[in-house]
């Protein structure tokens, strides 16, 4: 019985692959998701990605997300990120997608839901990023960057959809949503 479940799991997987050539590709993955779906995909070096969910009944939902990154990278690298086909279409719930290609990219998707009064403070999302060339005397060059999202991706989805998609060096992105029900 275990082997049949394993086979079903392997056959039911969709493509969400990244390679060492700084190319991230999600193709037709996550269709008809229900509930909470969190996807972090990175191709390249030194990426930080968070999908955070905090739910509180009768109290205060909070999360503190801190990312710090210090590394040497070459900004001339080529990078591409793509979400293709009908990926994440016709879903229902909370979806968080972080997709990056390149180096030293930071991404956060955060959702806080609570009952009762609550203040929303964006200071809890603290990010620091330093990107340095290995040799500061080298001439500055820029590589090719490409980000693609299919016009069929995410169609028909309901609920919360948070997407960060980047190709390059030293990008910082955050999507935050705070909901209080009184």
Curated annotation (Swiss-Prot):
GO terms for biological process: cell adhesion. Disruption phenotype: Deletion of just fapB in an overexpressing strain yields cells without amyloid fibrils. Deletion of the entire fapA-fapF six-gene locus shows no visible growth phenotype. Keywords: Amyloid, Cell adhesion, Fimbrium, Repeat, Secreted, Signal. FapB_R repeats lie at residues 22-58, 80-114, 150-180. GO terms for cellular component: extracellular region; pilus. Residues 1-18 form the signal peptide. The keyword Signal applies. It comes from the Bacteria. It is found in: Fimbrium; Secreted. Belongs to the FapB/FapC family. Forms fibrils in vitro; in the presence of FapA the fibrils are slightly narrower. A minor component of purified amyloid fibrils. Fibrils are resistant to boiling in 2% (weight/vol) SDS and require >90% (vol/vol) formic acid to dissolve. A minor component of the functional amyloid in this bacterium. Probably nucleates fibril formation; FapB nucleates fibrillation its own, FapA inhibits FapB fibril elongation. Upon overexpression of the endogenous six-gene locus (fapA-fapF) in situ, cells form large clumps during liquid growth, make large amounts of biofilm and produce amyloid fibrils. Expression of the 6 gene operon in E.coli strain BL21(DE3) induces flocculation and biofilm formation with copious extracellular fibrils. This is Functional amyloid subunit FapB. The lineage of its organism: Bacteria, Pseudomonadati, Pseudomonadota, Gammaproteobacteria, Pseudomonadales.
